[in-house]
Amino acid sequence: VFIMLNKKLLNEILAKYDVKIKKYDHFILAMSHSSYANEHNVSSNERIEFLGDAVLGMLVARYIYENFPFLPEGKMSKLRATYVCENANAKYAKELQIDKLLLLGRGEELSGGRQKDAIINDAFESFLGALYLTNGLDDVKKVLEKLVFPHIKANDQIEFIDYKSLLQEYVQSETRASLVYKAVSYTHLRAHETGAYL
């Protein structure tokens, strides 16, 4: 069964941020997980995710630069990493209801792919990439102003803990060793689980 993007829900989501779109091509691509793409012989969201990740990182960096004038560079990077990471992005994605827009293959759907942070994170970045290509940077900023920036302003970082960075910092403070990351399982040729080794 070939499932199409829920355009009605997409428009309802965008309306909350005072955003309107006329073209859906980029959003169909953005919501097409590799499992869906493989089943239907279409392109997946991997390339547009790359773009969305860059747009998100740049706009958050600019927000931090403009709103935290006395923060040194290292702490600016740490602050950005707290609010632009898989855990945080998955929370933003759920608030946006991107999990309901996702196009997944049958196997991924049955294995609970709609609830997996890694998949939802990728879809969130892809969504931002699609919005950037469709409407430009200003509309991406409109979404982030309501969805992401308030968390940074409130500094409610307990909600968004970047466990990978915490582990790295602990290891570096306690030992001279460095962590090595290795993929331990795969789904549709993409790393699904990663182990950290000393």
Give residue ranges: language-model regions.
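Double-stranded RNA-binding/processing signature
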Residues: 1-196
